[in-house]
Amino acid sequence: MTEPFIFIGAYTIKEGKLEDFKRYWPEFVDFVEETEPRLIAFNAYLSEDGTEVGIVQVHPDVSSMEFHMKLIREHVEHAFAEFLDRGTGMQIYGPSSDSALEMMRQLAGPVPLTVKPHGVGGFTRSAAEQAHVVS
């Protein structure tokens, strides 16, 4: 089984734009869910004070991430123009490609980009929400 490609990005939300971001995000999530059937997980988490957002993506492989980046380019540009001030850190876990790393470096700019390409074992449950506990 191929190891997943995991991306975690942290971004500062522009002052006064939290509510606008919170209205925009569900529309963006719907777009991603409808157009990217291979994407395993796509979630955002706000800091306690609402000044930062962390975005976590789990892809089955790097080609899924490459497709994602090409598909959402305009959405990313819109988000930075309207809601997001800057990135504060990016992390990549799992096997990557030169083209994916280059896209991530361009997106990161001066922000630290941590890459950990070598998995040492684990598992992925893509149907975990359907599981149930037997007592």
Residue ranges and their predicted role:
Residues 1-53, 60-74, 83-135:
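Short S/T/G/P-rich N-terminal loop/turn motif that feeds into the first structured element of a domain
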